[in-house]
Amino acid sequence: MSKYGRLSTHRVHIHGESRRDAFGDMMTSYRDVSPTELVAALRAEMDNFEKISPPEWAVDVKTGTHREMPPVQEDWWETRAASMLRKVAIHGPIGTNHLAQMYGGVKNRGVKPNKAVTGSRNITRKILQQLDESGLTTLKMNASGSKTLGRVITPAAHSLLDRVAGKVASAEM
């Protein structure tokens, strides 16, 4: 019973509880599988999207001021894009600054106390623009259309995430 005295009809998805499709079969959601395995499998699917590719400057940049060196992995851009798509799906509508904070870290300032810093907003913005061009995310506006609330995933991205999660879940069993 809610605080207003009537039963709530809102159904909350509980982690580990699978949904059923129209035929009564169990469906696996992207929330049901391990994030690490989902991002790795989703990274492999990112090859199908031509718009998601690292710019030429991506080999020389750090991912934030808290890093000492650029990423070592060859496919770090696609991995970050897959991870960012998952984060937009879970936390959306979400903006560039909040995503950059999620990819931030602790900056070593020598003898001074460490300090929390955000990740690169430029990398975050460019990846979100590429996800928009690929049709995986879109901007959500408020009811009057005057203010941007952040990015959300499209139905195509939702089905992609659930399809990849189904593959990951079947590989685990």
Task: For the regions a language model picked out, list residue spans one by one.
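Short basic-aromatic helix/loop recognition motifs at nucleic-acid
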Residues: 72, 86-92, 115-119
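Short acidic, hydrophobic short linear motifs in intrinsically disordered regions
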Residues: 93-115
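Short, amphipathic alpha-helical interaction segments positioned at domain boundaries
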Residues: 148-173
